[in-house]
Structures are given as C-alpha cells and as structure tokens.
Amino acid sequence: MHRRNGDALSGAAPTLAEPAIRLLSPADSIADLTTLLHRAYARLGALGLNYTAVDQSPEVTRQRLGGGTCYVATLADRLVGTILVHPTYATNDCEYFTRPGVACIHQFAVEPGLQGGGVGRKLLARAEQWAREHGFHEAAMDTAEPATHLVEFYARLGYGAVGHVQWPGKVYRSVVLGKPLVA
C-alpha cells in the first residue's frame, strides 16, 4: 500500500506523527482494544492459527488484562497497538512462564497498516523497561511455531527459543521465547 497524504493507517509507517506509548487507562474502551486485537490477529487466523486474540470477546480481553500491566500505542487518539506484561504467568502448561524473575508478555498487537513501522518495537521496549524496573531479569513470550515471520521478528529483537508448549485447544504448537534483560 502507498501512503496517502495524511492517512497514517494506509500501510506506511507514520512520518509526521509518532504514536504515543502509555498505560491503558480506565477511560480506554475494552471493546476498541478487542477490535484492535481482532484486526491485528486476522492474518494469523486466516492461516488457520486459532490464537485467542483472533476472536476473543471483550470479557476475555478484560480477564486477560487482570494481574498484568497493559501499554497501548495511540495515534490521533486511536488505539493502534497494545502489549500486556505479567509479573509471572501462573500456568500448569508452560513451566518457563512460572520461573522467578521472568516477566511474561502477551496480547501483543499492532494495527495491520502500521506493522513494520516501529510501533511494535516501541511497545516491546516499553514492556521490557517495565520488567527491568520491577526487578525481572528476563522477558518471555510464546507464539505459534508456524508463524515463522513472528519467530524471526522476535529473534531480531534478541528473543531465542527456550522451549515449546501445546496450549489446550490450540491447533498449533507454540515456541516459547526468552530474552535476558540487561539493566
């Protein structure tokens, strides 16, 4: 896609306005956040990957936010990205996420027309900063193993495979990725 004059969502990274990264606020719409997740994960859903964010309800979005810290990227007062960091993720399915000192990153999404423009890198950097500020020595996340473009993107940002997990109800195996956090 080509950037139309003044259209930040046309497919090119914004040049005049940079998205603001901030904490999710009580004034932010959970329905809008959920719709952003649906748009961002639609390509993955079309590949047959049943990520939770493909079709989760606003209630599920709200539940997933519980116990975590959510950052959003906004552009012209519109939500264009999000990331959720948990101090530790309580699960019986992935031992790595329960390790002391590991902050877990979930629900990471960027407006499709802005992907590749640095919004995701800024969100991820902010989540990692939060983890360092709160005494965590590593960040971890997972993604579908068949989503090789995502695995490669995270590898470029310093994340390496540390294991695998088969989440209940998912049609794919996830690769668990970890990154040491340097102060």
Which role does the model predict for each range below?
Residues Y154-H164:
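Conserved acetyl-CoA-binding loop of GNAT-fold acetyltransferases
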Residues A140-V151, W167-V171:
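Conserved beta-strand-loop-alpha-helix junction that forms the acyl-donor binding cleft
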Residues V72, R78-P87, C104, A109:
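Conserved beta-strand in the GNAT
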Residues F108-Q115, A144:
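A short, internal acetyl-CoA/4′-phosphopantetheine-binding micro-motif in the GNAT/acyltransferase core
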Residues T34, H38-Q63:
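Conserved GNAT-fold acetyl-CoA-binding loop/helix
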Residues K122-E138:
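Conserved acyl-CoA
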Residues T88-I105, Q115, H137, V171:
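A conserved beta-turn-beta hairpin within the catalytic core of GNAT-like acetyltransferases
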Residues A20-T35:
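A short beta-loop-alpha structural element at the N-terminal edge
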